[in-house]
């Protein structure tokens, strides 16, 4: 099952950083779905393939976990 992160929601990375998902997009050449997100602390922007977003961390836990407020 594919887990699609929700835009405008905050996720915690397994290393501790907090990130806001901005939107999902599609790579123009490969059609791969990308997760576009922003660091809450630094304001930096990132894009990561959805497959990578959903991969477990090296320790086996979720790479990103939805933070419920």
What are these regions (language model features)?
Residues 2-14:
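Short coil-to-beta transition motif at edge beta-strands of beta-rich domains
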Residues 10, 28-30, 65:
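Residue-identity detector for threonine
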Residues 14-16, 32:
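Short connector loops at helix/strand junctions that flank enzyme active sites
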Residues 17-26:
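Short beta-strand-centered aromatic/proline hotspots
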Residues 25-50:
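Basic/aromatic-rich interaction segments and small domains that mediate binding to polyanionic partners
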Residues 44-69:
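Intrinsically disordered, low-complexity, charged/polar segments
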């Amino acid at each position: 099952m594919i887990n699609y992160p929700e835009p405008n929601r905050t996720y915690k990375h397994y290393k501790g950083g907090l990130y806001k998902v901005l939107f999902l997009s599609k790579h123009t050449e490969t059609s791969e779905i990308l997760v576009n997100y922003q660091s809450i602390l630094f304001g930096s922007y990132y894009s990561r393939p959805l497959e990578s977003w959903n991969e477990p961390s090296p320790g086996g836990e979720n790479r990103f976990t939805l933070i419920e407020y």
